[in-house]
């Protein structure tokens, strides 16, 4: 029995390993700056090696985990999770998790249309082509979409900003569309509830308020994320991937040129070395206080910040209208409750008065020796007895009515009743 159990466990082990390997890899849609898009299956460690991202940043894109909207700028990539848009943006390509989703198909369609525009092609800068030697040209030419101004003043936005703009535009349009749909449905439902309070209308408004709270939370999160980026210049500077890539190439070329140029320089003059060190140190200190050039990204984020803030204001107005409708309904219900309480007071007063009349009738029903209770002996006494009966009856009723009216008057005078 033991010999038979060993091959089974050995056969199960490779299957488990393959399952773990399959679970660690995912399909990605790779859209490069130049070339055709392709579907590739990458593992987690491959993505980390390609983009330089830590594992915690990749968990932001995990469809199983629930993460809020996030934009993370890293050294070699930008991680974006906005609504249904999930992407890893580098200086040369964008990686999108491949799964069957309507939002993903719409996002890829918008991305293709944006990258197919004339400014989406790799920039061929004539001024840069005439500059320097072949090494510098090769370093600059290897970076697609490099945002270096040519003869004109306009700059071509780098590839990562084009993709980031598509992500922001897609998320903002989706939230704005949901807000407009909610607005068209909310105002008539609230007006209908204000005119007629019913269980069906209350349930409809409750569902609308749940949608509004959920939508407001998502819009608020994107707004806070954009506000956080706009407040931090260093975070925005980290998102200039193409610039950092080009600076790495230029710094490598300059370092090689400097090493060749100053290889034969005499370093015996200590004074020149001290002056050079002082200038370098002062340059470093002054560079700390220089604001990075982030105007292009700042304008992009501000535009979508204004748009998402307008969407949030629309939701705020809907919430205010819902609160006003709720206050109006509460006032109506309070008025109805006051009317019922007044009716209860009037009915209680009438009950007390009628009870007093019944007590009077009970007193007259007792066997007491008074002239009113004597049996009439003559027709004249019969007539007088009948007249006394009706006088007593009408007097009792009139007295009860008078007491009731007096009680109502006292209640109105004391403003207990309206």
Swiss-Prot record:
Required for magnesium transport activity (motif): residue ranges: 365-367
Domain of life the protein comes from: Eukaryota
Membrane topology of the entry: Multi-pass membrane protein
Region (Disordered): 119-146, 258-287
UniProt feature, compositional bias: Basic and acidic residues: 258-268
Gene source species: Oryza sativa subsp. japonica (Rice)
Pfam families per the UniProt record, alphabetical: MRS2-like
Compositionally skewed regions (Acidic residues) per UniProt: 269-280
Keyword annotations of the record: Coiled coil, Ion transport, Magnesium, Membrane, Transmembrane, Transmembrane helix, Transport
Entry coiled-coil feature ranges: 166-232
Sample GO molecular function, one term: magnesium ion transmembrane transporter activity
Alphabetized InterPro entries for the sequence: MRS2-like
PANTHER family: MAGNESIUM TRANSPORTER MRS2-E (PTHR13890:SF34), RNA SPLICING PROTEIN MRS2, MITOCHONDRIAL (PTHR13890)
Protein name: Magnesium transporter MRS2-E
CC per GO annotation: membrane
Biological process according to GO: magnesium ion transport
Record's function text: Magnesium transporter that may mediate the influx of magnesium.
Compartment(s) of residence: Membrane
Similarity comment: family membership: Belongs to the CorA metal ion transporter (MIT) (TC 1.A.35.5) family.
Transmembrane segments: 344-364, 389-409
């Amino acid at each position: 029995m033991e010999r038979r159990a060993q091959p089974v466990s050995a056969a199960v082990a490779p299957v488990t390993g393959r399952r773990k390997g399959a679970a660690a890899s995912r399909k990605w849609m790779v859209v490069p700056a130049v070339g055709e898009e392709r579907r590739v299956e990458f593992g987690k460690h491959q993505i980390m090696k390609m983009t330089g991202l830590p594992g915690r940043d990749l968990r932001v894109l995990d469809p199983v985990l629930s993460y809020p909207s996030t934009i993370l700028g890293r050294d070699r990539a930008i991680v974006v999770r906005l609504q249904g848009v999930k992407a890893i943006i580098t200086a040369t390509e964008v990686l999108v998790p491949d799964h069957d989703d309507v939002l993903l198909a719409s996002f890829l369609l918008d991305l293709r249309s944006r990258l197919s525009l004339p400014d989406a092609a790799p920039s061929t800068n004539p001024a840069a082509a005439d500059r320097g030697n072949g090494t510098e040209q090769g370093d600059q030419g290897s970076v697609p979409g490099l945002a270096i101004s040519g003869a004109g003043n306009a700059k071509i936005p780098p590839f990562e900003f084009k993709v980031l703009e598509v992500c922001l535009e897609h998320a903002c349009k989706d939230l704005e569309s949901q807000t407009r749909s909610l607005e068209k449905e909310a105002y008539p439902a609230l007006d209908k509830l204000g005119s007629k309070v019913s269980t069906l209308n209350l349930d409809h408004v409750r569902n609308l308020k749940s949608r509004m709270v959920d939508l407001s939370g998502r819009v608020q999160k994107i707004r806070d994320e954009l506000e956080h980026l706009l407040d931090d210049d260093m975070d925005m500077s980290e998102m200039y991937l193409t610039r950092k890539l080009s600076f790495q190439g230029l710094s490598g070329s300059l370092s090689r040129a400097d090493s060749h140029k100053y290889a034969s320089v005499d370093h015996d003059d200590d004074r020149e070395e001290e002056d050079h060190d002082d200038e370098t140190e002062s340059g470093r200190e002054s560079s700390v206080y220089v604001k990075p050039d982030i105007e292009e990204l700042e304008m992009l984020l501000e535009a979508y910040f204004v748009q998402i803030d307008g969407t949030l204001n629309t939701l705020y107005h809907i919430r205010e209208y819902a609160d006003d409708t709720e206050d109006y309904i509460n006032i109506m219900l309070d008025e109805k409750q006051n009317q019922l309480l007044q009716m209860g007071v009037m009915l209680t007063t009438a009950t007390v008065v009628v009870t007093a009349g019944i007590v009077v009738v009970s007193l007259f029903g007792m066997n007491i020796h008074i002239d009113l209770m004597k049996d009439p002996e003559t027709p004249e006494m019969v007539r007088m007895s009948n007249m006394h009966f009706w006088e007593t009856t009408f007097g009792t009723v009139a007295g009860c009515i008078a007491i009731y009216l007096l009680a109502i008057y006292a209640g109105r005078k004391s403003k207990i009743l309206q």
